Each structure stands twice: as C-alpha cells, then as structure tokens.
Design a protein with these regions (language model features):
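Beta-propeller domains
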Residues: 1-526
Length: 526
C-alpha cells in the first residue's frame, strides 16, 4: 500500500480545470467544499495523530458540465504561528506542543501556567458550516474561521464564548427549513456547573442590527443540560433532531478535566485524558424544542461510543433515532500516525465493528405500566424500552446493519421518517472500502467499490423538484470513456446516480494535473 498518511499535501491555489469524459447532469451546478487534515509535519516536528493535521480546504466547482479544483491551507492563527516558527508551537488534541528549549526559565514557566487553562487551537479541520450567507471552517473547540467559499481565503476568527458559554462545540450542526443553525457545546465549570449547551444561530440578522454583524454574533442559548459529572463531561461528536425534539447521548466516553488541566505539565496530550468506562451507562436525553426542557423520564442504554447520529424522527408516541455505535473507543487510537504504516490496511483492526442501531424512546410513560413491560408500541422496529422499578426506562436497540460509517441522508428528510442511508462501508478495518446505499425498509443494500480506492463521506444532492427520497435523474450511458487514475493521486471526486449506484465520476489531483473520470457501468459489486 502506498504510504499517504502523514505526507504534507501541496496546495492548488489557482483553479485547475479537470478533463471530463462522459457527462455531468446539467442541473448539477455549484461548489462542493471539503475540509480535512493536510499537513502533519512542520519543520522537524510532527503531529502524533491524523486528526491533528493542519486544515486543508478543498473546492470542487461544477459549472455547465465542467469541474474546477483548488485547495488552500486554512490561514488560522495556529497555521501562521507554526509556519513562522518552522515547528509545531500550538497544541492539538493528540499532540502537545512545548516551548523552544532555547527559551529562558521565565518563558517556560509562563508556558506551563498558560496551558493549565488552555486556549484551544483554531485549526478548524473537521467540517464546513453555513450561517446565513457566511461559511465557516469548524473544529470541536470554541473557535470557527470564516472563509470565502469561492477563493478559499481565510477571513474572520470567531470565538463562540463571546456569544454562548461553551468551551467545546460539535462540527455537525443541524439546519431547519429556514436556515437557522442548531448546535451543541460543552460549558466546563461555568458558575459551578458543567453543562451541555444547545444553542441556535439565526439564518438572518434583524435589519436594525445588521450593520457589521454576522448571524453567529446573534447566537443564543436554546437549552442546557447539567452534566452528570462536574469534572468528567461526556465527549460527543454529533446529536440528533426531530421536528419537535433534540436527541443527545451522554455516553461513558469522557473527558477528565483535571487531567486535561495538568496534561502539559505531565508531558501528555489532551487525548490521553479521554477514557471509556465499560461499567457505566449511556444516558439518553430527549429535549422538547417547544418547551426547551428535557423530557423528565430517565432513559438509558448499555455503554457505547457514538460519533455519528444518522437521523431521528417521531412515530406513534416515540422518538426513533439511528446512530453508528461502537462497543469501545478503539477507533480513535488506530489513527495515531505511528499506527498508519504501510501495513495499516492489513494489520489495523477495530475491536468493535461500527453498527447501525435504531433506538425507540417513548415520550409518555404510563405510570401504571408493569415493571419490565415494553413501552414501545411502534410496529416498524424491534427496539424496546423496558420500564424499571425506579421509573427509569432501559432502551435496547434494533441492530439494522453491521459495518458502516460516515452516514449521510437526503437532508430534506432530516428529522422526518426516512428510508435511505448513504455511507462508507467499514468492517473490522477502519479504512472504508465501499460506498453503500442502505434501504432501511427492505434491509438491503447496494455497494460500489474500486481497487485502491478509499471512499470518503458521501454527499447526497437531490434532483431539483424530486418527489422520491433517492430521486436522481441520470441514467447509465454505454458510450462514455474511462480513464484510470494517476498512481499518486490523493484527491478524488465521484459523481454517482444513486438509485442504481451505477455512474461514478472521479476527479483526481496530483503534481501532473487533475482529471475527472465519469464511469458508467452496468453492474454493481455486491
């Protein structure tokens, strides 16, 4: 296997036109923005973890059947400081940066003191968030960076803490039909409380307040939930929403705040301060968006680690929600760069395969129901919710599928009953090998794969005016040419006709230029 992990990627600052063989649907117009780690070595210093790398923004502009690609490193304060010093000087979650050994004792002492209550990185490498007409690169700290979606220039630095009291925030917000943003963050020991904060960013700013103001600066707290532990809040990567409720999992994968505060002095990374407790429970919080208060019943399930919520909706008095769950936290450990060697695909094995699980949570619990009775009356799932003697409810999921990650849906169905999931297939190795379309109703799937291809998170773009959830108009063509990828390519764009998963366009970029290939095939790899 060609070693690509840990190599610094070269920017493509000016748009380069891709060669298209075949045709792109005429209605597909716009710009796809991607974000992720691109630089893992600065001078002689190296990051420890794949998800520590400096953010590289990617842009695929599709206009009238043509594709243009460009990429640019996010000009964060972190990036600039590291490049100017020619070494890593800003700590990331898996890599602790230390002062220059040439500094005097007073400078070193100040560095140790400042890291006790750290100012986190603005290396926003996880996702892109849209707020009104603005676009932001995001990570899981309190910082986001505004970017120009056309040029990929880095603009304003925004600190969530100026508007809502959060030290950490997710990179997977939700959007309502009006374009308002709903997100979650953790507030650590604020006024004696550690809490999970749900906050809302309006899509537009009132006319009287528009001057010089962006929607983010009008963020407001929607609801807060007290952490079960003051100094060990739960880690979470995403959450779920229905039309009337928010779904939050307080899982036993936790941050130890005291250990984080002393990590710098102890010579360890912040990531080492996370731990999974197999003896603890996963608590399910259901928040009513109308009252802005949690449903009072205590719901819980077995210990698990969830990074991605898929979707949630209401049916017959229950909230049904789907997540990708693990039995432990081994996934994060596998992406330390020391483990990403040439034998990574063959030797790296998860101790828990990611499973698609459906939970059903009853919104109204009958006080007269017998202890041990199943409170779920929904016929579409085998998930159960068992009443216990103390009034708590133990939820057991229905396992829908084993071996998928990076789930996406037709977002028009977010918070509503839905049928299809588009994801990357992941078995015991953390490397995705196939793109998968899963049908929840029939429990069947369609798959696509190609040799030496690692598919990333898919994105569903519905047909304009589509009536069906998976409606895309393009159909296979027998006359389209095929050109293989360059051996050293590291960036690809695939365009698929989803009902059949039969048409793929791939854009590759390397030092020899960029190519887009549209491949139309008659058969699938099952």
């Amino acid at each position: 296997m060609e070693i690509i992990f840990g190599q610094n990627k070269i920017e493509q600052l000016e748009p380069v036109q891709a060669k298209v063989t075949g045709s792109i649907p005429a209605w597909l117009q716009g710009t796809l923005l991607r974000n992720g780690p691109g630089m893992h070595t600065v001078g002689e210093s190296k990051y420890n973890h794949w998800f520590d790398g400096l953010a590289l923004l990617h842009s695929f502009s599709i206009r009238d059947g043509e594709v243009f690609y460009r990429s640019k490193y996010l000009q964060s304060d972190t990036y600039i400081a590291n490049i100017e010093a020619n070494r890593i000087v800003v700590s990331e979650f898996g890599t602790m940066a230390y002062p220059d050994p040439c500094k005097n004792i007073f400078s070193k002492a100040f560095s140790y003191l400042s890291h006790t209550i750290p100012d986190f990185t603005d290396n926003c490498l996880i996702n892109i968030m849209k707020c009104g007409e603005d676009f932001y690169a995001t990570t899981e700290t309190n910082y986001i960076r505004k970017i120009d979606p056309q040029t990929l220039e880095t603009l304003e630095k925004v600190d969530y803490r100026k508007y809502v009291a959060v030290n950490l925030a997710t990179s997977h917000p939700h959007y309502d039909e009006a374009g308002n943003v709903l997100n979650m963050g953790t507030s650590v020991v604020d006024k004696g409380r550690t809490k999970y904060v749900i906050f809302k960013i309006p899509a537009t700013v009132p006319d009287s307040k528009k001057k010089g103001k962006s929607p983010v600066k009008h963020a407001e707290v929607f609801c807060s939930i007290s952490s079960r532990s003051l100094l060990s809040p739960s880690y979470y990567h995403s959450f779920g929403v229905t039309e009337n409720y928010v779904v939050f999992l307080e899982q036993p994968f936790k941050l130890d705040i005291l250990k984080m505060a002393t990590a710098y002095m102890r010579g360890v990374s912040w990531a080492s301060c996370m731990s999974f407790n197999r003896e603890d429970k996963t608590y399910i919080h259901i928040i009513d968006q109308r009252t802005r208060k949690p449903v009072p019943t205590k719901f819980y399930t077995d210990p698990m680690v969830v990074f991605h919520h898929v979707n949630a909706y209401e049916e017959d008095g229950c909230v049904l929600f789907d997540v990708i769950a693990y039995e432990d936290s081994s996934l994060y450990q596998l992406f330390y760069l020391a483990n990403l060697n040439k034998d990574f695909e063959e030797k790296s094995r998860l101790t828990s395969v990611p499973t698609l699980r459906r939970f059903a949570v009853p919104l109204h619990v009958d006080k007269d129901a017998e202890v041990g009775s199943n409170l779920v009356k929904v016929s579409s799932t085998t998930a159960t919710a068992l009443k216990e003697k103390d009034g708590h409810v133990y939820c057991q999921p229905e396992v829908l599928y084993e071996g998928l990650e990076l789930p996406r849906i037709n977002y028009a169905y977010n918070g509503k009953p839905y049928r299809y999931i588009f994801a990357a297939e992941v078995q015991w190795s953390p490397v995705p090998t196939k793109i998968l379309k899963y049908d929840i109703l029939t429990k069947s799937s369609l798959k696509w794969s190609e040799e030496s291809c690692w598919p990333a998170e898919p994105l569903f773009v519905p047909t304009p005016g589509a009536k069906d959830e998976d409606d895309v108009p393009c159909r296979p063509s027998r006359d389209c040419g095929v050109q293989g990828p360059h051996r050293k390519s590291h960036c690809q764009l695939s365009i698929a006709c989803v009902p059949e998963i039969s048409a793929f366009g791939r854009q590759t970029e390397d030092n020899q230029g960029s190519t887009v290939i549209l491949r139309y095939t008659e058969n699938l790899n099952y």
